Amino acid sequence: EARFGQVRGTPPEFSSVSVNGSRIPSAEGDIRNVQLDLIPADMIQTIEVNKTLMPDQDGDAIGGSINLVTKNSPRRFTLNAVAGSGFNWVSRKAQMNFGLTVGNRFFNDRFGFMASASFQNAPAGSYDTEFLWEKDDDGKVYINDYQIRQYYVTRQRQSYSLSLDYTFNEHNKIWFKGIFNNRNDWENRYRTTLKGLTAKGVADVRVQTKAGTPDNRNARLERQRTMDFTLGGENRLGIFSLDWKIGYARASEERPNERYIDFRLKKQKFDVDISDERQPLASPLEGYTMTLSDRFSLKELTEQQEDITEQDFKMAVDLKTKLGKSASLKFGAKFVNKTKRKDIDFYEYTPLDEKGFMSEALAHTVDQTNSRFMPSDKYKDGTFVSKEFVGSLNLNDQSIFSRDQVPAELAGNYHAREAVTAAYALVDTRISDHIQFMGGLRLENTALKYTGRIYDDETETVSKTEPAKSSYVNFLPSMLFKWEPGKDFTLRVGYNQSISRPKYSAIVPGMNISRGDNEIKIGNPKLSATSSHNFDINAEHY
């Protein structure tokens, strides 16, 4: 269930993730990170991790590169089926896992295929307490924000992969690899918050339900998809070996009809026991409450639509030839055309008959108090408006609700285009019987075109920026020495220069002006990539 991979202990954005050697686009909105939990483990044959990058590898991986290799065509008929189950303590529901792999070779072993499918359904959840601590003027600590949360999540994964290859003769081969992954997360969250809790124990109580529409199980649906399709070939052209490939990849994230309903009761008083700092407890004083009732008022009712897509079109050519008996030269070029779009639409709704709406909402509540609450059973999450009620609301009925678009939520929308053109040369030579050297140079040119948004909280307006263009070039040398004085000892010494391109939110030419907070956030499309000099020494003794 780990989400992002880390190499060398660097942040995830400093490493790259690829499938069969091709970078995967990111379904995240503001960053380039790829969620590894999108791809089930049973779809992967091998995981390759490279820390010292060679010139024939993409240069944007300071920490290193993680390459997920899908299953290749087998040498003979293969059939494998997997089924599994489990039980989740929080959701009190069973989990299911199914997998099927089949492959064979035909036409005198010239044609091979391997097809795999995987399905996982995992109802899960979590119990959560969160506290924000502050100090008063006398240096005394107190809790400023106090939250009790319950999550119920059903994660469903579907994954399909296909590998084909056809060998014309010993010098010519063509292959295809494709993978499609779909992950649906249906999430409901029930949260009680003591907002702005003072050192004297006074706070506003907020009670919130996170839900969705009936067609999405009355839950917030997050649907992430990735797909990668690559056609390649291996050919012998005289003294040259030619490898080529052309591919298309796409990643997307959809969050349709994500709804929140939030109620508030102002200025309640609490006795806050912080003698146990890991499990502080706030108890309402007599006459005060943190349980949803008709004393509360509607704070907000919102709905959000989110659509994020990233697409890559890729071409690569590699040529290799021998330079004498103990050396070879490899060189090639690669082109990637990337487009990315982030679109969010956000509305606040106000019931025209707020008193009648409150009565109806309070008639559709559910008690989430749970003796199995893992942090401690002393925390009582309380009563919430049910997810079914939130999902059933016809928010577009103008006779029931008025609506207002929230411009601040649209400020992060953008459209981006990146074109990366790369060329490299790599020499591999054996200096002696015990020493091998690999080294070369990679050149990458990055051209950008971005359109963002400008938001001003004084006028409550959002407008598109003019397209901003920029480009930069990186020269990335690398070398690796390998010394093998005997069969049981190997010493490697490597150096390479690599980069990490800025996250999207940093280079989109947007502007977010918050005059009330005296803050302004500005994207800088002229930002260049972060560069790094990497040195590696590795010794192995068997």
Language model: regions and residue ranges:
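Transmembrane beta-barrel wall of Gram-negative outer-membrane proteins
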Residues: R92-L194, Q224-L231, N235-G238, P477-M479
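Short acidic/polar hinge/loop motifs at secondary-structure boundaries
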Residues: R23-K51
